[in-house]
């Protein structure tokens, strides 16, 4: 039997970069229709800022293996809503995931298919377990990049379509200088 070789990589804890990783950049234009305040979205779209970057080390898409990635989620808001990742269910919904906060301040918004939502604040050292069947999105509630590590089954896949179509049942906003998790008026059951 030929065995896969182990690897060891250093993550730059200041920048979130994993040397040699596959890099994905998501700009505001990639998040059209995700934010509530369309007027604020269109105004900020003139600059089309980078909202987040992902540095992924991916394995062959097969059961039993693991992928890992860092995400650098930049600070910012569209209207009152903090910058966030697209969010997804797993294509194989019975797959779980682990997130680990490295730098900055934010949180994870999780949701069942029926819309039951949980908000878990995150900072350096916070570990979040995402159970099977829960959609998840990270949100930067701070003033610096929010950097975290994700570890997930190589065969989990991503279902972005369900979130694009229905959204999350809650949104994370700043109101009166505080982080608030409120009902999303556009959420569809």
From Swiss-Prot:
GO BP term (any one): glycolytic process
Binding site residues for Fe cation: 88, 90, 97, 136
GO cellular component, one term: cytoplasm
GO molecular function ontology, one term from the record: glucose-6-phosphate isomerase activity
Domain of life: Archaea
Keywords: Cytoplasm, Gluconeogenesis, Glycolysis, Iron, Isomerase, Metal-binding
Primary subcellular site in the record, as a coarse category: cytoplasm
Reactions catalysed: alpha-D-glucose 6-phosphate = beta-D-fructose 6-phosphate
Pathway(s) it belongs to: Carbohydrate degradation; glycolysis; D-glyceraldehyde 3-phosphate and glycerone phosphate from D-glucose: step 2/4
UniProt xrefs under InterPro entries: G6P_isomerase_archaea/bacteria (IPR016758), G6P_isomerase_prok (IPR010551), GPI/OXD (IPR051610), RmlC-like_jellyroll (IPR014710), RmlC_Cupin_sf (IPR011051)
E.C. no: 5.3.1.9
Subcellular location as annotated: Cytoplasm
Coiled coil: none
Subunit structure, as described in the record: Homodimer.
Family affiliation: Belongs to the archaeal-type GPI family.
UniProt name for this protein: Glucose-6-phosphate isomerase
Origin species: Thermococcus kodakarensis (strain ATCC BAA-918 / JCM 12380 / KOD1) (Pyrococcus kodakaraensis (strain KOD1))
Gene: pgiA
């Amino acid at each position: 039997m030929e065995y896969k070789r182990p690897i060891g990589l250093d993550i730059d804890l200041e920048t979130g970069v994993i040397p040699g990783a596959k890099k994905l950049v998501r700009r505001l234009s990639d998040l059209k229709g995700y934010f509530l305040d369309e007027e604020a979205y269109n105004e900020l779209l003139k600059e089309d800022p980078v909202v987040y970057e992902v540095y992924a080390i991916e394995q062959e898409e097969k059961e039993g293996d693991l992928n890992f990635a860092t995400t650098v989620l930049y600070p910012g808001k569209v209207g009152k809503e903090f910058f966030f990742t697209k969010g997804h269910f797993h294509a194989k919904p019975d797959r779980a995931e682990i997130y680990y906060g490295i730098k900055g301040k934010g949180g994870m918004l999780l949701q069942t298919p029926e819309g039951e939502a949980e908000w878990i604040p995150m900072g350096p050292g916070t570990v979040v377990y995402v159970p099977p069947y829960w959609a998840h999105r990270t949100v930067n509630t701070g003033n610096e990049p929010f950097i975290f590590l994700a570890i997930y089954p190589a065969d989990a896949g991503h279902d972005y379509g369900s979130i694009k179509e229905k959204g999350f049942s809650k949104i994370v906003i700043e109101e009166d200088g505080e982080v608030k998790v409120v009902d999303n008026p556009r959420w569809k059951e």
